[in-house]
């Protein structure tokens, strides 16, 4: 026997306990046959998943996390949904810190009976309006907007900005939708921090490093830069689109990620690009991950120095 022999309504259950599989119509004899054939695979004591769910998890990190979240929901209770970092993984929202391997984040409504969470489950209790919940990879999960608000409430301000910027950049949420969820959570712990991150968010920050730099610049009291500014020569010939620009000072700052110059050709192209920017009268400051988090005061000092320097070299 294979799952194709079972009604479609039953096959939609990707993960369940023995009792849950029987509740959707699989008889004890069918269950034994399906497990012997490998159509249902034991993923935890008393919990079985379809072979397709297990195979998908092995080929796709998001599917893998979805399967882990589904198993965790079985343990905690079906009223719980994937949230916070787990929801960010499923939605493809960037995080400053990579989620711990094998850990799942869930939220359940207050007052609901809770099963016994196993090690590796972070369980939150909060209201879950139906409009804040969706389904991804067969798992109930908070919407992208609710996910961002939860992250911004529970993590640091910088981590919240990273999530807000990422979700805006990839079109996972809108300013209007964000404001609506913030109103729903206005009295919750961390709501003020989430509101600050939301107000500071920008779809124009193109990487986690750029989002973090925006926070560092603002906290140092630098003027707010223009993001992804298009720079041209006096003859209106396009030169480049730059990460940060302060037009009043003719200063550019570039966030150099780890993969930005991983090829000699790309490094040479960057040198030539900088020469053209300087020929156009701009002062260019580069900084890396290590500098921004290790010696941020030096990055700020270089930018302030560029503000004060003559326009052309």
Across the structure, where does each feature detected by a protein language model lie?
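Short gly/ser-rich loop at a beta-strand->alpha-helix junction or flexible surface loop bordering the NTP-binding
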Residues: 1-190, 308-313
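Surface segments flanking catalytic/ligand-binding clefts of nucleic-acid enzymes
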Residues: 1-4, 8-12, 20, 25-29, ...
């Amino acid at each position: 026997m294979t799952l194709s022999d079972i009604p479609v309504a039953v096959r939609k259950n990707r993960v369940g306990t023995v009792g849950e599989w029987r509740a959707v119509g699989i008889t004890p004899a069918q269950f034994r046959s399906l497990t012997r054939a490998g159509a249902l695979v034991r993923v935890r004591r008393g919990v079985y998943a379809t072979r397709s769910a297990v195979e998908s998890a092995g080929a796709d990190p998001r599917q893998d996390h979805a399967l882990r979240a589904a198993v965790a929901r079985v343990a905690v209770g079906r009223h719980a949904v994937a949230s916070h970092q787990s929801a960010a993984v499923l939605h493809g929202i960037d995080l400053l810190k990579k989620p711990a391997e094998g850990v799942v984040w869930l939220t359940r409504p207050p007052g609901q009976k809770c099963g016994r969470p196993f090690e590796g489950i972070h369980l939150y209790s909060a209201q879950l309006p139906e409009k804040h919940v969706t389904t991804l990879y067969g798992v109930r999960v908070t919407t992208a907007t609710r996910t961002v608000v939860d992250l911004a409430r529970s993590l640091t301000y910088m981590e919240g900005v990273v999530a807000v910027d990422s979700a805006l950049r990839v079109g996972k949420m809108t300013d209007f939708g964000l404001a609506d969820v913030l109103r729903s959570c206005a009295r919750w712990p961390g709501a003020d921090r989430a509101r600050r991150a939301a107000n500071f968010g920008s779809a124009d920050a193109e990487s986690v490093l750029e989002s973090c730099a925006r926070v560092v610049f603002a906290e140092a009291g630098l003027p707010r830069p223009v993001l992804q500014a298009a720079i041209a020569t006096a003859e209106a010939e396009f030169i480049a689109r730059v990460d940060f620009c302060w037009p009043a000072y003719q200063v550019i700052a570039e966030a150099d990620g780890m993969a930005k110059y991983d090829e000699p050709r790309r490094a040479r192209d960057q040198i030539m690009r900088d020469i053209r920017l300087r020929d156009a009268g701009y002062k260019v400051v580069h900084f890396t991950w290590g500098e921004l988090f290790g010696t941020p005061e030096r990055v700020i000092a270089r930018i302030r120095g560029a503000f004060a320097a003559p326009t052309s070299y």
